[in-house]
Swiss-Prot record:
The lineage of its organism: Eukaryota, Metazoa, Chordata, Craniata, Vertebrata. Disruption phenotype: Morpholino knockdown of the protein results in profound anemia without affecting erythroid specification. No porphyric phenotype detected. It comes from Danio rerio (Zebrafish). Solcar repeats lie at residues 13-149, 157-241, 251-346. This is Mitochondrial glutathione transporter SLC25A39. Cleaved and degraded by AFG3L2; degradation by AFG3L2 is regulated by the ability of SLC25A39 to bind iron-sulfur. In absence of mitochondrial glutathione, SLC25A39 binds iron-sulfur, preventing cleavage and degradation by AFG3L2. The presence of mitochondrial glutathione prevents iron-sulfur-binding to SLC25A39, promoting cleavage and degradation by AFG3L2. One of its GO terms (cellular component) is mitochondrion. It is found in: Mitochondrion inner membrane. The chain crosses the membrane at residues 19-39, 120-140, 163-183, 213-233, 254-274, 317-337.
Length: 359
């Protein structure tokens, strides 16, 4: 890259076309990654039983008061992590069945497909896409718009531009989606109707203020913003080097796929400690939403939690799950960015063709 301005592919397409390209990429990425995560969850389910807990009536709108079985776990569709709260195995039975014993990942794929049908590998996908697709559309469109603004309107060029644009774009997407994810967790854990939702939100805001809607925002930002900054920095760098190596002015699908996988793997490894902390925080917040805030102590701060992990397990604790994260993140990034770039190229060629026909 150096001080060379990048080819402005996005200049020939509209923001709406960027949104369509990123939305398509988001759906395809989710279709590809979701089976991997469903299998992971099912393998975890046979090792970790649901825990017993008493649901405390700590809010006027929190109606569950009887002893109940709860389990909070993370579900990822390749774009976002979502907290799922299981209540007596009923609210997420398709995701968390444990009737069949699995000896490993491949065995789980075969048995789930054979016993429950192919569709069961995509259990839980539609509800998560409701937020994952808008978040991805905001994120990728904002990145292109910010990068082009810095490069072509402000006149800045250099390797730091993707770093800045990627971090700011992710910060904006996380800030918009974070309250919606908290609301979704409340609705799921408490079986709230839409008519009850505003009462729930007003009660939460009255007690803890408007910032309570962004509970869990900090750990998400600490993981996702550095990840995005590193991802776009490495992606643009690797893509430019591959284009130079193959002497092509515009990245092909293969080049975008390769650059996406490499940059995704690098960013995943470097931000793994924040991912470990964020996972723990999300589980704690999910349990708090399910059981009532009064019944559980407030979760530790991000830095305290990271320090405790370091004291208890050392660097191995902070880099736990290294291989599974890379295996999941690298292909997800590759599929998403290559589909997005392909979509942008398609719209660019379409717009150029229409412009020529209009002359």
């Amino acid at each position: 890259m150096g001080d060379r301005p990048a080819v402005r592919i996005s200049a020939a397409i509209t923001p709406v076309q960027q949104m369509l390209a990123s939305g398509t990429g988001a759906v395809l990425t989710s279709l590809f990654v979701t089976p991997l995560d469903v299998v992971k969850i099912r393998l975890q389910a046979q090792q970790t039983p649901l825990f017993q807990a008493i649901a405390a009536e700590s809010r006027p709108w929190f109606r569950v008061t009887r002893p109940s079985k709860w389990k909070c776990f993370l579900y990822c569709n390749g774009l976002m992590d979502h907290v799922y709260v299981c209540q007596n195995m009923s609210s997420c039975s398709n995701l968390y069945k444990t009737s069949t014993h699995f000896s490993g990942t491949l065995d789980a794929f075969v048995k789930i497909t054979h016993n429950e049908g192919l569709r069961s590998l995509w259990s839980g996908l539609p509800p998560t896409l409701v937020m994952a697709v808008p978040a991805t559309v905001i994120y990728f469109t904002c990145y292109d718009q910010l990068r082009d603004f810095l490069c072509y309107s402000m006149g800045y060029h250099g390797d730091h531009i993707p770093l800045i644009a990627g971090g700011l774009a992710r910060l904006g997407a996380v800030s918009v989606i974070s309250p919606l994810e908290l609301v979704r967790t409340k609705m799921q854990s408490r079986r709230l109707q839409y008519s009850e939702l505003m009462v729930c939100i007003r009660s939460s805001v009255a007690q803890d203020g408007w910032l309570s809607l962004w509970r869990g925002w900090g750990p998400t930002v600490l993981r996702d913003v550095p990840f995005s900054a590193l991802y776009w920095f490495n992606y643009e760098l690797v893509k430019a080097q591959l284009c130079e190596h193959y002497r092509t002015p515009q990245a092909s699908f293969t080049i975008s796929f390769t650059a996406g996988a490499v940059s995704g793997a690098i960013a995943a490894v470097l931000t793994l400690p924040f991912d470990v902390v964020k996972t723990r925080r999300q589980i704690q917040l999910g349990e708090m939403e399910a059981l009532g805030a009064v019944s559980m102590k407030k979760p530790s701060s991000t830095w305290n939690m990271m320090r405790n992990i370091w004291i208890d397990m050392g660097y191995k604790g902070l880099f736990a799950g290294f291989l599974p994260r890379v295996i999941k993140v690298a292909p997800a990034c590759a599929v998403m960015i290559s589909t997005y770039e392909f979509g942008k190229t398609f719209f660019q060629e379409r717009n150029l063709h229409q412009a020529r026909c209009g002359l």
